[in-house]
Amino acid sequence: MNRNEITLQEMFSSVIGELREGGRWGTAHIYQSAVNAFSAFTKWQPMPMRKLSPTVLKRFENFLRQRNCSWNTVSTYIKTVRSVYHRAVDRKYIRYVPRLFEHVDNG
């Protein structure tokens, strides 16, 4: 993966593959549902991870609420995005942005 241009969807795909390889099918299913929702939010356009911002995350949260997702679903999907984001930071694909998830519901 190109470190400078990795998309959220590519990173999700990598993490989902790792989860499946580890036999964590339920968790992989939740991550797949989260990336599907995020892709619908972006109208199936790739989202470079470097473009994640508090505004984008808040819009995603609002998108989910407008689709009548429960608060539990919203929180779960935001948590999966946060988890994938932190894995990308740990792998040095992107730089850490302090308080990126501060203004969204993440449980």
Protein language model regions, located:
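N-terminal core-binding DNA-recognition domain of tyrosine recombinases/integrases
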Residues: S13-G26, V35-G107
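Glycine-rich, histidine-containing beta strand-loop boundary motifs that form or position
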Residues: Q32
